[in-house]
Amino acid sequence: TWSGDGHNTPLEMIRAAKARGLKYIAITDHASPLGMLKGIKPHNYKKYIADIRAAAKKVPGIRVLVGAEVDILPDGKIYLPNYVLKELDWTVASVHTAFKQSKEKITQRIVRAMRNPHISAIGHLTARIVGRREPTLLDVPAALAAAKETNTALEINASWYRLDLNDLHCRMAKSADVKLVMSTDSHDEDAFDFAFGLGTARRGWIEARDVLNTLPFERFVKEMKK
């Protein structure tokens, strides 16, 4: 992949998604200032988009959204400039650094990211890694209110080491009428597995109708607009 964080090409991922029966997929490689990741940058984003669109044309029967998972910087700014973000079909903003900020700072950080009109969703909201990293001190109710206000979706990350949103946060999000999406966080072609995410969502009383990417593609595209 572009960032080096994944293990298969976009074409291989698209083919694997189709083989799993998916009707559409979002390719969201990393855009990050972290030195260990190459990723999407202002100088190469046009080639990134062109490469994925070219791969998508080779696999009929599945729709492909060209996206990115973009770092939320410690001050809440988004790593990529808006002129890049607006060219993407689907943009997830996530925290990958500065996990120990105060409750006030991390909440302001997430809310500021949500207010960017080009951000489609917030990924793994509390940034926890099961058994390895505690959640941030985020004020979750405040974040849910901002998500509702800004029409920003929240991710139910189905990876077994994320499960973020957790079940309680899923229930809170549903009560707050916040849009939800479920992702597999796939980093290779064998990782298209929603099982853990489905279990988490069901414990949070989430139904299929509560998750945007259960919708047909055209309705999903309409609903995801801010």
PLM-predicted stretches and their roles:
Residues 1-63, 74-226:
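Charged catalytic cores and adjacent phosphate/nucleic-acid-binding surfaces used
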Residues 27, 68-69:
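Core AdoMet radical
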